[in-house]
Every structure is written in structure tokens, then in C-alpha cells.
């Protein structure tokens, strides 16, 4: 481990000098991970690409020389790899670019990680959703190219960096730059279209999980790994509230005291609805819990309110609730 003896005595770890590199730091999860480490006495370096500057380092993760240069210069004790193409329908349409980011960039990063503890963010979509819940040792069987690309990314990470950790998470939401940034927060648009009825999926079961909670888990894992180099392999983290997108949308309406009578549950998947999704890929998360590394998930209504209140159309609501 750069900077001190990885896995050695605790006395050798000097808190101000703990360094973490966060890839995809401009993205939905990456921003939360970067903030979590930064706010807890870590020297954090975030990198991105299209949206990197001026706050983060611009780095092309497909450029081995660039990746090597960043790691050798910063010498991180921990790397959290959040960068990914995480939109299943986009992966289907732009497969080559998605595979480059979701698979080949993983291989590059893992090869160059050196003594750093590497956490790779993966997905519940590595499972087919036919026999939940899924434990860390259950056999993956992804239904779509996104799930296949993330599974290949896992394999590249663990092949080139056997001491790495894979953290699988479900559908995510959190503080967004625009509501379309998350498949959960985008449902707010349906809520605020109160004048027109709209149908919303009421088939597929989801476990919407707050990015701030995932970020806390990443920091817990990182801090444990500095003391215990046996922390490696596959882990699961998920919120426990089970909802369809219809139920999420109704919960969002309730959180903002908005009507939901215009929302209509759709109980059959329409033909041509994009990439196939698993019916219920619930993650069983006992490994993190047994190690004392899990965190209690933030209740959905609280977290979604914190995430979406800046996008409320009626500005008077903010004054009523927050003042």
C-alpha cells in the first residue's frame, strides 16, 4: 500500500495522509463517494472525463499511460471505481463504447492499482431475477448487455487485482444535477404532471438505494481494509424497501404532499420496452452485515425528499417544510 505498510499496525496509519482516488467522481454515485471521504479526513482525488473540469481531474480511463500517471503521482491507498455506463438501454444502443468503459477500463485500472485497495461498484443486474434473494456466492446470469458488461468488469478486476472488492448495488438515487440523472428521481416528472394520467411499471420489483448510504459503506470498507488485508471478494449492499416504479412514484408524491390519482399502475411489460430487466434481483447482504461494515439505509421518503426538493415546481413548499 503506498504511503504505509498495507495491513500493518494501526499506529502506522496517519489519518490526514489517507488518500483515495474516486473514478466517475462527476457522476451520481461518484459525487456522493467523493464527498463522503472528503468530509471524513481523507485526501480525496476525483477524476472524470466529459464533466471533470474545473473541480476534478480529467482522465481517460481507457488510456493506460494516463491511468498509470495518475496512480503513480497520487499514490492512493484506496481506489473506488464508480465510472461506468449504467443505463441499460444506452448500453444496448452504444455497445462498443459501453464495453470499453465497463470492461476494458476495469482491466486497465486493476492492472495499475498496485498496492491500492480497489473497490469496484457493480450491479444487481448480474442476476436474472428469477430466484431472489441473491447471495454473494450465487451464480450470476445477466439478462441484458449492461449486466453482462458489469459481470465482465468484475472478472477483469478480480483477475488483475485479486485483493480487490466488488460491491454490488441495486438501482440508485441521490442528489442529482437534473432529475433525469437517476431512473428513480426522473419519476418526479410524472408526479408533477398532475393534469395528465400516465402509466408506470408495476411489475418489476426494485430496491431503490440512496447514494449517500452506499458512499458510507465504501468508506467503511476502505477504513477496514487499511487494517485488514483479508477484506476482498464480492459484497452486496441494498436498501430493504421493495417497490415497483409505480410504488416509488406514489411514495414520491406522498413525500411532497402531491396528488397521485393520475398515476396508473401498468401490470404487463409492453413490447419493445428496451433492454430486458430482471423481475426481482433482490440482494442478500449478510457478508457486509457480519463484518460490521453495513449501514442502516435511509428511509426512502426521507432520502427522496432530500434529493428532489430543489426541483419542486411550487417554491412555497420549500418555505413551508424547511423554514
From Swiss-Prot:
Pfam families according to UniProt: RmlD_sub_bind
Pathway: Amino-acid biosynthesis; S-adenosyl-L-methionine biosynthesis; S-adenosyl-L-methionine from L-methionine: step 1/1
Binding site for NADP(+): 26-29, 49-51, 60-61, 82, 86, 146, 172
Gene3D superfamilies: NAD(P)-binding Rossmann-like Domain
Region annotation (Required for interaction with MAT2A) ranges: 308-323
GO molecular function: methionine adenosyltransferase regulator activity
Record bears the keyword NADP: yes
Keyword Transmembrane: no
Keywords: NADP, One-carbon metabolism
Gene Ontology biological process terms, A to Z: one-carbon metabolic process; S-adenosylmethionine biosynthetic process
CC annotations in GO: methionine adenosyltransferase complex
Function: Regulatory subunit of S-adenosylmethionine synthetase 2, an enzyme that catalyzes the formation of S-adenosylmethionine from methionine and ATP. Regulates MAT2A catalytic activity by changing its kinetic properties, increasing its affinity for L-methionine. Can bind NADP (in vitro).
Assigned protein family: Belongs to the dTDP-4-dehydrorhamnose reductase family. MAT2B subfamily.
Oligomer status and interactors: Heterotrimer; composed of a catalytic mat2a homodimer that binds one regulatory mat2b chain. Heterohexamer; composed of a central, catalytic mat2a homotetramer flanked on either side by a regulatory mat2b chain. NADP binding increases the affinity for mat2a.
Name recorded for this polypeptide: Methionine adenosyltransferase 2 subunit beta
Organism: Danio rerio
Amino acid at each position: 500500500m503506498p504511503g504505509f505498510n498495507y495491513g500493518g499496525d494501526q499506529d502506522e496509519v496517519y489519518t490526514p495522509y489517507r488518500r483515495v482516488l474516486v473514478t466517475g467522481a462527476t457522476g451520481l454515485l461518484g459525487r456522493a463517494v467523493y464527498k463522503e471521504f472528503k468530509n471524513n479526513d481523507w485526501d480525496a482525488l476525483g477524476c472524470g472525463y466529459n464533466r471533470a473540469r474545473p473541480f476534478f481531474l480529467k482522465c481517460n480511463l481507457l488510456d493506460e499511460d494516463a491511468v498509470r500517471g495518475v496512480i503513480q503521482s497520487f499514490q492512493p491507498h484506496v481506489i473506488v471505481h464508480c465510472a461506468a455506463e449504467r443505463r441499460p438501454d444506452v448500453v444496448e444502443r452504444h455497445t462498443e463504447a459501453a464495453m470499453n468503459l465497463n470492461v476494458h477500463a476495469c482491466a486497465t485500472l486493476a492492472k495499475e492499482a498496485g498496492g491500492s485497495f480497489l473497490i469496484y461498484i457493480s450491479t444487481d443486474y448480474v442476476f436474472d431475477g428469477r430466484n431472489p434473494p441473491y447471495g454473494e456466492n450465487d451464480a450470476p446470469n445477466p439478462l441484458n448487455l449492461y449486466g453482462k458488461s458489469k459481470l465482465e468488469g468484475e472478472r477483469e478486476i478480480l483477475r488483475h487485482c485479486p485483493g480487490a472488492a466488488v460491491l454490488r448495488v441495486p438501482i440508485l438515487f441521490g442528489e442529482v444535477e437534473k432529475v433525469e440523472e437517476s431512473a428513480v428521481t426522473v419519476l418526479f416528472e410524472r408526479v408533477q404532471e398532475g393534469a395528465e394520467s400516465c402509466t408506470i411499471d408495476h411489475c418489476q420489483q426494485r430496491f431503490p438505494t440512496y447514494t449517500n448510504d452506499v458512499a458510507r459503506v465504501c468508506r467503511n470498507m476502505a477504513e477496514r481494509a487499511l487494517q485488514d488485508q483479508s477484506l476482498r471478494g464480492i459484497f452486496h449492499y441494498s436498501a430493504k424497501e421493495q417497490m415497483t416504479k409505480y410504488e416509488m412514484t406514489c411514495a414520491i408524491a406522498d413525500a411532497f404532499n402531491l396528488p397521485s390519482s393520475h398515476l396508473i399502475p401498468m401490470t404487463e411489460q409492453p413490447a419493445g420496452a428496451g433492454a430486458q430487466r430482471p423481475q426481482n434481483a433482490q440482494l442478500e447482504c449478510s457478508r457486509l452485515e457480519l463484518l460490521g461494515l453495513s449501514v442502516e439505509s435511509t428511509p426512502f421518503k426521507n432520502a427522496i425528499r432530500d434529493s428532489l426538493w430543489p426541483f419542486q415546481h411550487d417554491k412555497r413548499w420549500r418555505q413551508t417544510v424547511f423554514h
